[in-house]
C-alpha cells in the first residue's frame, strides 16, 4: 500500500533523536523558527509569513507551537505531534509577538535554561519582519547555535522518505510526457505548462484517491519551462520569455511532484523539429557528462568527484567555458538542500542520500542543454529514481 505521508511513528523517532542530542549537549530545549524544520519533526505545514512562528521541543515537557492565532485551528488538523499551541493575535500588534514568545517560554519554565536555536532573533525574519531579538527579551536564558541540527538529520533519507520520493518520481514521468506532447508551434510555454500540470494533477488525484493531498505545494504536480525556450534555454534560472515556441527551439522542461511534502526533480532538454548538427553535438556531450556522473556515484566517493567527472567530459569536448553551475544538489523537502555535488565539497556520499544529477552547458544567444535526474545513493552505488528517456531521438518533438 502506498503511503502519502511520513508515519506518526517516524515523527516520534525524530523527536526522540532530537531529545537525545539535546541531552548529550546539556541543552534544555530546542527552539526552531524554520518552517521546513518544523515540518520535518512534526508533519505540520503552514504558510510562513512576516508573522513569527516557532516550535519548542523541551527535553522534558510538551512539544509546543508558538505562532499567530490564525494557525491555532490548523495545527490539530495536520499533526498530533504538537501537544500545545500558544498564540498571539497578529504582527506587529499592540504587543510585539516576540514579547509574547518570551512570556510563553517563561511559562514553560525555560526563562533561565540553555536552548539550542536556529535563530537567536526568535523569528525567521521574512517579508519585512522587524523586532527585538528574543535573546534581549530573555536575558537570563542562554541560546546556543543549533542551526545545523535538523539539516544534518535530513541528509540521509529513511525508508519512508525514499518510498515517498519513488512515488514522486513515478508521477513526474507522466507530467514530463504531457509537457512533451503538448508542445506546439506558436504555443505559449505557460499555456503548455498549465495544461500538463492540470492533467497530470487530475490523473494523479483520481488514481491515488481521496486521501492524497499535496502537503507543501499548491498543486500535486508542477510542470513547466520557466521561459527556457530557444535562446532563453541558455539562462539556467530563466523565469519567463516574451515569445512563443517555434520550430527549431531547444526547450527545457522541469517537473516536481509533492508526495508527503517530498519531491523528486526531473528535467529534460527537448528539441522542437529536426535537430541541427550543432544542437545534436551539444545535446550528446551533455548526456555523456551525465553518464560519467552516474558511473562515479558509489559509497565512499566524494561529492566533488561527481562534479569533476562531468567537468572532465566538458573540458574534453571544449565546452568547459559553457558550464554555469555544479552537477547537482540534495533533494527532499526543498528544491535545493545539502549536499552539493560541487568541486569544492569533499563530503563523502552515504547510502540514503538523494541528489539531483544535472550537468549542463549554456551558450548565450544559442541554447542550453540540461537533463536532471533524481539519484538515490545505495550500498551498491546509485539508483535512478526518475527514468524518463534521455536520448535525443526520444526527446525530439516532430
What are these model-derived regions, one by one?
Residues 1-398:
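Active-site neighborhoods and metal-handling regions in enzymes and metal-associated proteins
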Amino acid at each position: 500500500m502506498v503511503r502519502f505521508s511520513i508515519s506518526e511513528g517516524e515523527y516520534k523517532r525524530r523527536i526522540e533523536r532530537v531529545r537525545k542530542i539535546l541531552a548529550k549537549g546539556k541543552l534544555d530545549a530546542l527552539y526552531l523558527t524554520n518552517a521546513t524544520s518544523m515540518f520535518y519533526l512534526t508533519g505540520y505545514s503552514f504558510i510562513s509569513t512576516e508573522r513569527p512562528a516557532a516550535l519548542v521541543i523541551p527535553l522534558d515537557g510538551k512539544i509546543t507551537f508558538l505562532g499567530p492565532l490564525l494557525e491555532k485551528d490548523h495545527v490539530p488538523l495536520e499533526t498530533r505531534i504538537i501537544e500545545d499551541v500558544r498564540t498571539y493575535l497578529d504582527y506587529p500588534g499592540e504587543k510585539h509577538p516576540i514579547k509574547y514568545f518570551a512570556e510563553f517560554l517563561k511559562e514553560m519554565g525555560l526563562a533561565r535554561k540553555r536552548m539550542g536555536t536556529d535563530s537567536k532573533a526568535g523569528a525567521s525574519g521574512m517579508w519585512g519582519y522587524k523586532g527585538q531579538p528574543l535573546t534581549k527579551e530573555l536575558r537570563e536564558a542562554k541560546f546556543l547555535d543549533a542551526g545545523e541540527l535538523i539539516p544534518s538529520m535530513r541528509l540521509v533519507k529513511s525508508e519512508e522518505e525514499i518510498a515517498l520520493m519513488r512515488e514522486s518520481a513515478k508521477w513526474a514521468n507522466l507530467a514530463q510526457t504531457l509537457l512533451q506532447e503538448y508542445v506546439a508551434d506558436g504555443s505559449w510555454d505557460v499555456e503548455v505548462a498549465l495544461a500538463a500540470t492540470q492533467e497530470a494533477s487530475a490523473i494523479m488525484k483520481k488514481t491515488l484517491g481521496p486521501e492524497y493531498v499535496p502537503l507543501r505545494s499548491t498543486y500535486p504536480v508542477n510542470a513547466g519551462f520557466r521561459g527556457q525556450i530557444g535562446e532563453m534555454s541558455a539562462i539556467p534560472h530563466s523565469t519567463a520569455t516574451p515569445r512563443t515556441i517555434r520550430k527549431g527551439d531547444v526547450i527545457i522542461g522541469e517537473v516536481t511532484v509533492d508526495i508527503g511534502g517530498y519531491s523528486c526533480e526531473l528535467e529534460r532538454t527537448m528539441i522542437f523539429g529536426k535537430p541541427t548538427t550543432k544542437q545534436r553535438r551539444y545535446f550528446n556531450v551533455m548526456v555523456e557528462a551525465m553518464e560519467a556522473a552516474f558511473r562515479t556515484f558509489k559509497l565512499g566517493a566524494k561529492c566533488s568527484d561527481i562534479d569533476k567527472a562531468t567537468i572532465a567530459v566538458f573540458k574534453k569536448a571544449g565546452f568547459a567555458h559553457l558550464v554555469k553551475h555544479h552537477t547537482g544538489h540534495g533533494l527532499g523537502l526543498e528544491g535545493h538542500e545539502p549536499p552539493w555535488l560541487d568541486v569544492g565539497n569533499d563530503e563523502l556520499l552515504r547510502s540514503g542520500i538523494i541528489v539531483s544529477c544535472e550537468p549542463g552547458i549554456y551558450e548565450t544567444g544559442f541554447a542550453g542543454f540540461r537533463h536532471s535526474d533524481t539519484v538515490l545513493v545505495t550500498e551498491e552505488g546509485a539508483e535512478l529514481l526518475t527514468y524518463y528517456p534521455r536520448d535525443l531521438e526520444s526527446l525530439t518533438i516532430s
